[in-house]
Amino acid sequence: MREPTVRGRYYEDFGVGEEIVSGCRTIGEGTIDLFAGVSGDFSEVHTDAELMKDSEFGERIGHGILALAVMQGLMWQTNYNTGTVTATAGWDTLKFRAPLRAGDTVQAQWVIKDKRVSASRPTLGILVEACRLVNQRKETILTGEHVLMVRRRPAAT
């Protein structure tokens, strides 16, 4: 197999405190429906508009994990790590702060919180990104720390 084309940035190119912002995406009713089908989570909070009219939300809402998936997709679409990322090592301190609603336009925003060279794999660096997904009302939908493994520049290893 061939090596991936590198359009993204290597570990050395990131600075602690650097902020990165994605483009925007509007969430439709169909997105919520499709995610229910993919995930198998058909909970009425996500699928029953009539029942949810009288809930604390006033309408059905998107899945929390859908919000996470959308945020990760928005992050990927910036191409900040295309060809240099090797894996997501995990999501820490994930918190759902506000509901994701059909019609919301959302944006991913993140800051490089920490970085270190992998002790076990010196060709890789580990980035800790403090991430949040915000909507058009400037409400934070979710927050979390994304731990990402990124290739180091070949000359740096």
Task: Report each predicted region and the residues it spans.
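Hot-dog-fold acyl-thioester-processing enzymes
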Residues: 1-89, 153-157
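HotDog/MaoC-like acyl-thioester-processing domains
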Residues: 1-16, 96-157
